[in-house]
Amino acid sequence: MDDKQHTSSSDDERAEIATSNQDQQTNSSKRVHLKRWQFISILIGTILITAVITVVAYIFINQKINGLNKTDQANLNKIENVYKILNSDYYKKQSSDKLSKAAIDGMVKELKDPYSEYLTKEQTKSFNEGVSGDFVGIGAEMQKKNDQIMVTSPMKGSPAERAGIRPKDVITKVNGKSIKGKALDEVVKDVRGKENTEVTLTVQRGSEEKDVKIKREKIHVKSVEYKKKGKVGVITINKFQNDTSGELKDAVLKAHKDGLKKIVLDLRNNPGGLLDEAVKMANIFIDKGKTVVKLEKGKDTEAIQTSNDALKEAKDMDISILVNEGSASASEVFTGALKDYNKAKVYGSKTFGKGVVQTTREFKDGSLLKYTEMKWLTPDGHYIHGKGIKPDVTIDTPKYQSLNVIPNTKTFKVGDDDKNIKTIKIGLSALGYKVDNESTQFDQALENQVKAFQQTNKLEVTGEFNKETNNKFTELLVEKANKHDDVLDKLINILK
């Protein structure tokens, strides 16, 4: 995420689904325990840290409980011997901590898994701050994928969203410095800072790059928001955190009190959160004893089921779920369950597609290992990783909200032929200017509209689409997108 990690979290970061040992102990009557894994924190995306063990203890436990075959023991001995040799006999003095970290980093890197990572004590501290719920940053959920830092989704109402950051944007620089090769936590640390200070992100969208300046703010992730729109209740769920299920229940009861029979659960750009909450939330609409999600590792499968009767006030409601490519992790668990049981109709666009689960181990020295341990499936056995969940009814996002960033290092004028010129035309049309085609040609008609745009916005009137014009153009499109929710409006019209 900014600010959080999901392993995608928020700053980034990515969505998460988690069950903690503590939660399992205090809520044992309401949860199906994971047999072999019941003492391990399970995460999808952002991680909830619970187990604290030393490296020595970890090795001992594995030897004692699981056992090591001769090959494994030989490999472990080899690693130990190499460490001792380099630490004591290398001609230059070596840091034992750095050697240890390098060995662990090498093993994790060999997994070729963007969700597995080893964090130092400092990185773990930053990580913990990121998943606390309150932080100073830009409010952008991010993940590391293919050695790139990618935005999973900007949080609703966050500085990142207001600045135009979108899902799947790739961050290449922070304050002009390349982040190539940096760990997710390091990037998070760079993006964060003091309240009311600014950070400049270089964003790559498609083949183009653009600098985006964002003011850091104190971010508080509010779980659920309810609004009445005519005869439809719109419940926006921003994240799956502690007591989100309680907030959702309250919102549903409020809608019932308002006499509403149709409910929209808006999960767009929801990066996920706690698995327990996703199960409890599904239980509001799904009866007791039903499987909400299946966790699978090898040949072992464990079903997590609902433990209570469905909320009676919700039984007669017509439920619609609205999703997009920023809906990930727990959002997909919840959506997949209601879809499989025909409790809701899904609208919007295909979801992110994250169907693997991470486990964390925090060591005594404060460092932490996060690794993928299993995958999850919907009640009907659908594996959505890399595929996402397709909506029952597609509602396309307006063209202007899906445009690539136009590089502000280029100037376009009459006679030019470039794909970005099509973007200019679509954007100007969305802003109310008369554009009669969407070609890649910068013609006289477009020059006239650019001049009109410049004059209206008190810019130098040149007819050329330069840096200043581009910046204002982008600002107004972002403002329009934030003020007018075309997708939600279309859905409400469908439900009338």
UniProtKB/Swiss-Prot annotation:
Region of interest: Disordered: 1-27
EC number, UniProt record: 3.4.21.-
Biased composition (Polar residues): 18-27
Keyword Nucleotidyltransferase applies: no
Domain of life where this protein originates: Bacteria
Transmembrane segments: 39-59
Enzyme's top EC category: hydrolase
Gene Ontology CC: outer membrane-bounded periplasmic space; plasma membrane
Active site: S329 (charge relay system), D340 (charge relay system), K354 (charge relay system)
Pfam families tied to this protein: CtpB_N-like, PDZ_6, Peptidase_S41, PG_binding_1
InterPro entries per UniProt: ClpP/crotonase-like_dom_sf, CtpA/B_N, PDZ, PDZ_6, PDZ_sf, Peptidase_S41A, Peptidoglycan-bd-like, PGBD-like_sf
Keyword Membrane: yes
Annotated PDZ domain residues: 124-206
Bias (Basic and acidic residues) ranges: 1-16
Primary location: membrane
Gene3D superfamilies: 2-enoyl-CoA Hydratase, Chain A, domain 1, 2.30.42.10, 3.30.750.44, PGBD-like superfamily/PGBD
Location of this chain's protein in the cell: Cell membrane
Gene Ontology biological process terms in this record: proteolysis; signal transduction
UniProt entry keywords in alphabetical sequence: Cell membrane, Hydrolase, Membrane, Protease, Serine protease, Transmembrane, Transmembrane helix
Membrane topology classification: Single-pass membrane protein
Coiled coil (residue ranges): none
GO function terms (MF aspect): endopeptidase activity; serine-type peptidase activity
PANTHER family associated with the record: CARBOXY-TERMINAL PROCESSING PROTEASE CTPA, TAIL-SPECIFIC PROTEASE
Family assignment from sequence similarity: Belongs to the peptidase S41A family.
Protein name from the UniProt record: Probable CtpA-like serine protease
Organism field: Staphylococcus aureus (strain bovine RF122 / ET3-1)
